[in-house]
Design a protein with these regions (language model features):
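Short Fe-S-cluster ligation motifs
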Residues: 253-280, 284-285, 306-321
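Residue-level marker for beta-strand->alpha-helix junctions and adjacent short loops that shape enzyme
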Residues: 18, 59, 85-86, 166, ...
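Short low-complexity, flexible loop/linker segments enriched in glycine and/or proline
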Residues: 26-28, 92-96, 173-177, 258-260, ...
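Flanking scaffold residues of small Cys/His-coordinated metal-binding clusters
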Residues: 216-229, 267-277
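Alpha/beta catalytic cores of nucleotide-metabolism and tRNA/nucleoside-modifying enzymes
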Residues: 110-133, 143-222, 239, 287-289, ...
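Alpha/beta enzyme core
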Residues: 1-137, 143-161, 205, 211-212, ...
Length: 321
């Protein structure tokens, strides 16, 4: 009531902060207990005359449970995510984690670009849940207009930016709005409403994906610099489906920065599972691309596979060598 009397346009209930609050029974201590979050939100809604947003913690097994609790209590919207429990580093001389307070430390709240994938996942989960059905303010690592567009495509109705503003100042908001406007124009979209939520239903459970879909890595030798990072990644961390061959054997040119006779990577497409690791470690843009390979196989999900196995319609697929 005091916030409304002071002229606030709305209230955001902090049920997400993981440090300095939860130790006192507030912040994430509330957001981690849906029943408690529902009760406190209900108390606020009894008196609220302005919109109330419930800010949720990511430090929870299933964030939709807390989102549903906010919905049941009558909240006008939810926001997510707050920061993630973390320890940034340890001083290897004193053996005290940083930051240090009189020789001791505590966990902090991790934020910024690194938490964006976690935020997108939890945003989509809430946006897709029919029992939530609330406006969502998206938070977590938004730094560019592309980040903003991704949050909106996954259902965010508004966005909040903190870390990027701390780094670059409020001028970054102008860059984001300019970029979003240019993007919308390029796609023929009239407003953000045309973008909002377009990706929500594109995310499905793993069991609903096509097991017979096949992609392989292709190397553009005109761009390859011969660093062979893709070979190392595949050999030591993936499926050992990249060989080193001489340029003469492959009948390819030297490419930028390469020297004669130095081996270059060659993908054995029959063994490639399309994990994408090679393209991620490659330092050259679009040198390695993932290409869909038609294999003539009918679409089959994991559920289809299990049903056909149970009916004796097919044999078990052997594991990949």
């Amino acid at each position: 009531q005091r916030a409304a009397d002071a002229g606030a346009d709305g209230i955001e209930l902090n049920f997400g902060c993981p440090h300095g609050m939860c130790e006192r029974g507030m912040g994430s201590a509330v957001g981690q207990q849906p029943a408690v979050a529902e009760k406190i939100t209900g108390w606020v809604m009894e008196k609220a005359t302005i919109p109330v947003i419930v800010k949720l913690t990511p430090n929870i097994t299933d964030i939709t449970m807390a989102a549903r609790a906010a919905k049941r209590a009558g909240a006008n919207a939810i926001s997510l995510i707050n920061t993630i429990n973390s320890i940034t580093n340890v001083n290897l001389d004193t053996f005290v984690p940083e930051p240090t307070v009189r020789g001791l430390s505590s966990h902090g709240g991790y934020c910024g670009p690194a938490v964006k994938p976690i935020a997108l996942n939890m945003l989509q989960a809430c946006a897709a849940d029919p029992d939530v059905n609330l406006p969502i303010s998206g938070i977590g690592g938004i730094t560019t207009w592309r980040d903003a567009a991704e949050f909106i495509a996954l259902g965010a109705t508004s966005l909040q930016v903190c870390t990027a503003v701390m780094h670059y100042g409020f001028r970054i908001v102008e860059d984001m709005t300019d970029g979003l406007n240019t993007y919308l124009d390029s796609k023929g979209m009239k407003s953000l409403a045309d973008l909002r939520g377009r990706s929500v239903q594109k995310l499905q459970k793993w069991e609903n994906l096509d097991l017979n879909f096949q992609r392989v890595a292709r190397i553009d030798y005109e761009k390859c610099i011969g660093c062979n990072l893709c070979y190392i990644a595949c050999e030591d961390g993936a499926h050992q489906c990249i060989d080193l061959k001489s340029p003469e054997e492959l009948k390819v040119g030297l490419g930028p920065g390469r020297v004669p006779h130095k081996p270059v990577p060659k993908v054995r497409e029959e063994d490639c599972v399309g994990c994408n690791l090679c393209s991620l470690v490659c330092p050259v843009d679009e040198c390695i691309t993932m290409v869909e390979i038609p294999n003539g196989k009918a679409s089959m999900t994991w559920s289809n596979y299990q049903d056909r196995l149970a009916k004796g319609e097919m044999k078990a697929i052997p594991p990949h060598p």
